[in-house]
Amino acid sequence: MDAVEIVATVLVAIVAAIHVYIVILEMVLWRTPRGLQAFGTDQAFADRSAPLAANQGLYNGFLVAGLVWGLLAADPIGFQVTVFFLGCVIVAGVFGAATVNRRILVVQALPAAIALVAVLAAANLG
């Protein structure tokens, strides 16, 4: 594995790790002070929306599963799966930024876009 491939792999792993944290926030910590702070909500809203947050967390878990699958699968499948799931993360981040909070663009979409550029560069250089 050359340096560009290593960088791409690390960046994809970071995107997956970010989403593991989001899963934990949405499924486990939603009603806690950490969850309230992370999403800028109050206790009453968190209590009412906990089932929706858990559902959203589950979907973020699917993104993690896809990114890990892409990292572990042999090419060309690994490359294709990684590109697909990074694209899903980017779309989710852009949509979240447009509909919920612009910060999502930086937290979710930007790291995935950087990772996608690295993955494509590694594929073109390799």
Where are these regions (language model features)?
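Membrane-interface helix-boundary signature
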Residues: 1-11, 46-49, 75-82, 101-104
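N-terminal signal-anchor transmembrane alpha helix
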Residues: 7-28
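Cytosolic, membrane-interface loops and tails of multi-pass inner-membrane proteins
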Residues: 27-49
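Membrane interfacial helix-start motif at the N-side
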Residues: 42-61, 95, 99
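Core segments of transmembrane alpha-helices
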Residues: 56-68, 112
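Transmembrane helix-loop-helix
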Residues: 67-94, 98-110
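Juxtamembrane boundary at the C-terminal end of a transmembrane helix
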Residues: 119-126
